[in-house]
C-alpha cells in the first residue's frame, strides 16, 4: 500500500472553495479505486494550510490513477474549479508507507 500526503497552501479567504474542491476529489479518488482518508481544513493555527491523505493498493495503481486524472471529465472539472477560484496557491506531494500495527 502507498499513501499520498498532500500539503496545500491555500487562500485563507477561500477555505469554503477549498472544502468544495476537497469533496470533489474524495469521490473521484474513491471512484478510481483508491481510499480517500479525507481533507483537513485549517482550524486553529496556520490559516493558509490544508492537507489530504489517500491510499492506493500499490504505486502501479496510483500511476494508473494519475493517467486517468488527465482524461476524466470530472477530474478535469475539479482541477478547473481550483484554477478558476484560485483557492490553492501551491501544493506538495509525498509518498508514504503506512504502519498500522
Feature map (PLM): residue ranges:
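Absolute protein N-terminus
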Residues: 1-2, 101
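Short, structured motif recognition centered on aromatic/hydrophobic residues
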Residues: 2-7, 18, 29, 50-53
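Short beta-strand-to-loop capping motifs
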Residues: 7-12, 54-58
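An amphipathic, aromatic/His-enriched active-site/gating alpha helix that lines ligand/cofactor pockets
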Residues: 20-37, 55-92
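Short beta-strand/turn micro-motifs at beta-sheet edges
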Residues: 39-41
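Long, low-complexity, Ser/Thr/Gly/Pro-rich intrinsically disordered segments that act as flexible linkers
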Residues: 43, 88-101
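Short acidic/glycine-enriched loop/turn segments that link adjacent beta-strands
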Residues: 45-48
Amino acid at each position: 500500500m502507498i499513501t499520498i500526503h498532500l500539503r496545500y497552501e491555500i487562500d485563507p479567504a477561500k477555505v469554503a472553495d477549498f472544502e468544495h474542491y476537497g469533496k470533489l476529489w474524495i469521490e473521484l479518488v474513491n471512484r478510481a479505486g483508491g481510499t480517500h482518508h479525507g481533507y483537513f481544513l485549517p482550524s486553529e493555527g496556520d490559516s493558509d494550510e490544508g492537507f489530504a491523505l489517500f491510499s492506493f493498493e500499490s504505486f502501479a495503481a496510483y500511476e494508473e490513477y494519475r493517467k486517468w486524472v488527465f482524461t476524466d471529465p470530472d477530474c478535469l472539472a475539479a482541477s478547473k474549479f481550483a484554477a478558476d477560484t484560485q483557492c490553492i496557491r501551491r501544493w506538495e506531494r509525498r509518498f508514504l508507507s503506512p504502519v498500522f500495527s
